[in-house]
């Protein structure tokens, strides 16, 4: 229970961290049930204290902000999140609010699949783009990969503009086969089918996506110009276009019918082809939907009725510590194997050491294990009556299990702060090279992985010592590609200070905080906790994280700063951006250009532009090369400004 505004602000920061791990890193720290409980407490506090509500509260936004390496793409109509209900009384209260005003309302119920939400845009019957949910307003453009999902039609009979939305999932059977393949290849296993679906959809190599046997199950539409009267009619229309039908779909008139269908799904969930975590309930009549409208985050005409967790008893026989992508240490219990919902469970997350202490969980305890939402196994509580004296306290580690570095222990999480820790080094370098950091073109995760395998790099400093002959050893590297990467690495020297600070990947310090820190000069990271706390927007966790990070990596940071020679200010860059005709404009590139489109896209983004893959009424400029195709006609229809490559180069030159 949240008791003060300070606790409220801490809860927002904590939930946003969890959301980032879940949506962007595919690396959930806690189970769905724990997140839901924390979220509901936050929501209850805000209902009692509406004047305290913050814009960055998870109740005010959907999902998480999209991250690299995929381009951002806006949805034509927002993708909303659903409010959850957890029991009969909550469902009854939700239904009564609707039926009191609209007694004739009916409800469409369907299984809630636990996958990755995807928005497909069709125009003139062709698949134009596929975009993940992201923050609800824009997501990641994954069109090339989505086209390898067998049951996504590349063409449909309807010729108007329409967004078709659904869930990308992997079946239980295919998930088990995939993990078996990875086990045989000594590759890390996917924690659950949702992670497998997300990771497969976001592959840089579309051939990998093609092999993963993903499926797309539609559940609704976004923008369209059709005149449906009911939600059921809309779903039937989607199926008529060649999409897969939703199993166990039902139309219900009252609470009793909904409960009957809910319990039918619970009985059938074990034999269902994919993992489920509840039932979606949507008002069928579209005129009633329109009148009910939306909250800041969710539609008032739909909800997700969550399933109860599946639980069994077993024994903790050991504990290991895993190092996540951000350096977070997650204790994992080794269990006597127990079957839950058809899966043999021999491990379960303990989340963090604060959770272990709070629940008084001990080694050799008999415990209650649940699979919350059919995904991450979790230990809910110890069965203290079974204790026989053989139990021992689970000690919080003091050093990293991988690199033996001293750990940073916060109130809830424990982190490895060592940038050279092998468990987090690869992800740190991917972040180091990313668009919001040093923006090194061509240095993606596959290249970094090869560099590690060939023992050519250990940390970011090694990137700047690479030679042409080093890169020529890598798969698919020829002289031109190798030289381009070397040039891009050298070009990243002398960056704006905020970019280098952000590239370090310091816990709790993102792009905005890095820009604030850069205002204090090149020696800013040497400041004390008290000095950091005086900076606008900096709290205790951020200040401590900075101090501990610098203390652990002083030598590395000094060497990196000396080598890269960051600029104390990028005022010229900001001035150029603000005076640019492209600043805050949405731009689409099409056709064959003399340079790669990505190169032009990067130039325009540096000038404040937003790059999109599809033309709409919101597009400001269309940049056309040879064989521009249908996008040119669409731009002319919407009155979009069209520039050829020569005109674009002229405008770019004027800004130099």
From Swiss-Prot:
NAD(+) binds at residues 32-36, 81-82, 133, 167, 306. SMART domains: BRCT, HhH1, LIGANc. This is DNA ligase. The active site is at 112 (n6-amp-lysine intermediate). It comes from Helicobacter pylori (strain HPAG1). Pfam families: BRCT, DNA_ligase_aden, DNA_ligase_OB. GO terms for biological process: DNA repair; DNA replication. Transmembrane segments: none annotated. GO terms for molecular function: DNA binding; DNA ligase (NAD+) activity; metal ion binding.
